[in-house]
Amino acid sequence: MSPPTVPPMGVDGVSAYLMKKRHTHRKQRRKPTFLTRRNIVGCRIQHGWKEGNEPVEQWKGTVLEQVSVKPTLYIIKYDGKDSVYGLELHRDKRVLALEILPERVPTPRIDSRLADSLIGKAVEHVFEGEHGTKDEWKGMVLARAPVMDTWFYITYEKDPVLYMYTLLDDYKDGDLRIIPDSNYYFPTAEQEPGEVVDSLVGKQVEHAKDDGSKRTGIFIHQVVAKPSVYFIKFDDDIHIYVYGLVKTP
């Protein structure tokens, strides 16, 4: 297995706060278009992708999820791409000629007990680099992916975006090793007895970059196995970022 392809944009850190919502009042409210569209979760799709002056690429993949806090946003695993993408398939002008395919997503049998034992674990994942060298990436197995039963969500220290791999064979072959310290990667957030921590899912986030510019996004998912860890979708990026947020005194 080759190392994951690192997306072109990186993030140094996230500072999150709730942003004031702007409410617009209209005389007539039109029913959102996504309510009348076919449910495409679990479907195989293909479409063109046009980025700036670059030639059109043809992408093919599987729709994993429709984000509940932002229903126009879909989570997709594209064939041949290691990272998971978040796209507004019906709104993004870069998506050309979206087509739903008649193909079915295969559902092979899986050792559920072994699969579940990997969830929430910090791991060392070994990839084969150039000239047969071994590259070791440390990260965390976040969850089993929806729809594609043999795949897992995973993220890495070197690149905090959401990736998807079939990890069981790597684990059996010794190329995926569990790090005994479960808090190695994402420390567990301290919580007072009886304290109830509100989820940030659906809240907006602002990130200040090193150059002083800012980017905005939204928390779209809280990791069940590690509640201090969230998936973030930034407005200016198609990748899904993974960050652990720990309360500071």
Curated annotation (Swiss-Prot):
Key words of the record: Cytoplasm, Nucleus
Segments of this protein annotated with the region Tudor-like domain 1: 41-90
Top-rank taxon: Eukaryota
Pfam families registered for this protein in UniProt: Spin-Ssty
UniProt GO molecular function: histone H3K4me3 reader activity; methylated histone binding
Entry's Gene Ontology BP terms: gamete generation; negative regulation of cell population proliferation; positive regulation of canonical Wnt signaling pathway; regulation of DNA-templated transcription
Entries under InterPro entries matching the protein: SPIN/Ssty, SPIN/Ssty_sf
Site residues, Histone H3K4me3 and H3R8me2a binding: D159, D170
Cellular component terms per the entry's GO annotation: chromatin; cytoplasm; cytosol; nucleoplasm; nucleus
Region: Tudor-like domain 2, residue numbers: 119-168
Region: Tudor-like domain 3, residue numbers: 201-246
Subcellular location: Cytoplasm; Nucleus
Major site of localization recorded for this protein: cytoplasm
Region of interest: Histone H3K4me3 and H3R8me2a binding: 128, 237-239
Role this protein plays: Binds to acetylated and methylated histones, including H3K4me3 and H4K20me3, probably acting as a histone reader that recognizes chromatin marks and mediates downstream cellular effects. Promotes canonical WNT signaling, and is involved in the down-regulation of cell proliferation.
Subunit structure, as described in the record: Interacts with C11orf84/SPINDOC. Associates with chromatin.
Protein family membership: Belongs to the SPIN/STSY family.
Disease: Lui-Jee-Baron syndrome: An X-linked disorder characterized by prenatal onset, generalized overgrowth, extreme tall stature, enlarged liver and spleen, macrocephaly, dysmorphic features, and normal development. Hemizygous males are more severely affected than heterozygous females.
Name of the protein described by the UniProt record: Spindlin-4
Organism of provenance: Homo sapiens (Human)
